[in-house]
């Protein structure tokens, strides 16, 4: 995906402006639509230390997939697979990448799917978010999880919304970015709480069910 001059400048400037520009990238929705009676195969890559990746981030990505699957029972039969066989693939953006999250459509054995790229480096999101992530591991993990959830939503065919209650909200519409993440983080007590706190709004659930009806 091309990155605009403004987005590159915002990243260089740091702070919440950079965060907003990076999160607001208009990732197009993939053409993957509806249940096709085949498992939804997925692959979660390892990341490099310079990318900000931590080994436990792979579990956050799995939890995000499971949250979408729970939202539409029986429709998304998740199955781990080799990279070359996976319909949905999750990667961790390198440190020199100018995007925060991105989804790229791909085709696997004739099935339409997506490669998802996640930035795990909190320092790239500005001083306030970076410092808070160092003090509070759950803050960092909340952001990584929500980013996975958002980009995997694109992989499942969902586009952006203008409602800040939605995980598919587009930050280009404005709003308090720190508060957006804090609203999810605040009720969490342990990391395991993330697995049961989907982060999906009623509208998110309705939209994914329209594309992938429960069975």
Regions inferred by a protein language model and the residue ranges of each:
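Acidic/histidine-rich, surface-exposed loop or edge segments in extracytoplasmic proteins
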Residues: 36-51, 122-129, 185-191
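Extracellular (secreted or membrane-anchored) zinc-dependent metallopeptidases
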Residues: 164-215
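Disordered inhibitory propeptide/activation segment of secreted metzincin zinc metalloprotease zymogens
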Residues: 2-55, 65, 98, 102-109, ...
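Residue-level detector of alpha-helix boundaries and kinks
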Residues: 52-53, 137, 192-193
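Metzincin-family zinc-dependent endopeptidase catalytic domain
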Residues: 57-163, 173-176
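Divalent metal-coordination and catalytic microenvironments
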Residues: 42, 68, 150-153, 168, ...
């Amino acid at each position: 995906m091309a990155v605009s001059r403004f987005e590159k400048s915002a990243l260089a400037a740091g702070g919440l402006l950079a965060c907003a520009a990076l999160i607001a990238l208009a990732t197009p929705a993939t053409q993957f639509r509806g249940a096709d009676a085949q498992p939804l195969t997925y692959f979660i890559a390892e990341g490099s230390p310079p990318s900000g990746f931590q080994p436990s981030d792979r579990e956050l990505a799995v939890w995000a997939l499971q949250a979408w699957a729970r939202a539409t029972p029986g429709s998304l039969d998740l199955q781990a697979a080799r990279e070359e066989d996976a319909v949905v693939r999750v990667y961790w953006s390198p440190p020199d990448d100018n995007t925060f999250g991105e989804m790229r459509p791909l085709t696997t054995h004739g099935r339409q799917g997506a490669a998802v790229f996640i930035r795990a480096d909190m320092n790239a999101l500005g001083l306030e978010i970076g410092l808070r992530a160092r003090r509070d591991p759950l803050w960092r993990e909340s952001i990584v999880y929500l980013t996975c959830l958002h980009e995997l939503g694109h992989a499942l065919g969902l586009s952006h919304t203008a409602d800040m209650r939605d995980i598919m909200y587009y930050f280009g519409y404005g709003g308090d970015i720190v508060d957006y993440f804090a609203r999810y983080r605040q009720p969490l007590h342990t990391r395991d709480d993330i697995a049961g706190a989907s982060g999906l709004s009623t509208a998110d659930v309705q939209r994914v069910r329209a594309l992938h009806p429960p069975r």
